[in-house]
């Protein structure tokens, strides 16, 4: 009898690799309309790390609106930023942060994009994960984060050998969690929040 968990994991990993390689449609026009990258001065990278839950499946296991490769055990690593931070306090986020000068030199030495170096370094610092178990699949297009003056590169990763993670520094993070992807895709858990900054009100995705 085939191992359906391994098969689903392989399908998910292959789909993510195709996304990173530009073989799947990925529309970001709506995310680019607020500020072009040329107007922003700082660079950052985040690690979008997918894996397979070790213990319990998604609470949305019965939700039928997912692609076949999004099994009930597929998860993504997220954190909640500390409430005392100057920017994006208390917000959920991917592990990551500003690209440091030494990241550029290390990227040059290894012959890889600098976003990979920075995203993995920050993820280790924030969550304590073992980088040896992470397979970097590639990068998605750099996105503007005008509110904090950053150009952010999402780095796609596959957690081939998951390790224990948790809050490393309470001044940086309040929570580290592996969140089932099906829960994020389930419309019952998805909402729209309205954030007002000055005279402008922005719509943003929100999750229950």
Residue ranges and their predicted role:
Residues 1-94, 98-165, 182, 187-208:
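N-terminal leader/linker segments that precede catalytic domains of diphosphate-processing enzymes
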Residues 170-171:
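Short, conserved loop/helix-junction motifs that constitute active-site signature segments
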Residues 176-178:
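Conserved cytochrome P450 K-helix/beta-meander segment immediately N-terminal to the heme-binding cysteine loop
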């Amino acid at each position: 009898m085939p191992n359906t968990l391994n098969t689903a994991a392989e399908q998910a990993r292959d789909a993510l690799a195709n996304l990173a390689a530009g073989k799947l449609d990925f529309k970001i026009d709506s995310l680019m309309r607020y500020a072009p990258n040329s107007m922003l001065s700082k660079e950052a990278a985040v690690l979008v790390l997918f894996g397979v839950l070790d213990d319990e499946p998604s609470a949305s296991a019965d939700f039928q609106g997912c692609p076949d490769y999004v099994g009930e055990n597929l998860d993504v690593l997220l954190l909640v930023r500390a409430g005392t931070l100057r920017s994006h306090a208390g917000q959920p986020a991917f592990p990551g942060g500003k690209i440091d000068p030494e990241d550029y030199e290390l990227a040059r030495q290894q012959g890889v994009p600098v976003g990979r170096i920075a995203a993995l370094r920050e993820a280790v610092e924030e969550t304590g994960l073992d980088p040896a178990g992470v397979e970097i699949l590639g990068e998605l297009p750099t996105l503007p984060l005008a509110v904090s003056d950053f150009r952010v590169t999402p780095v796609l990763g596959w957690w081939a050998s998951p390790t224990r993670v948790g809050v490393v520094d309470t001044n940086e993070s309040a929570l580290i969690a592996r969140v089932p992807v099906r829960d994020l895709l389930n419309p019952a858990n998805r909402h729209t929040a309205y954030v007002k900054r000055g005279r402008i009100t922005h719509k943003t995705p929100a999750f229950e």
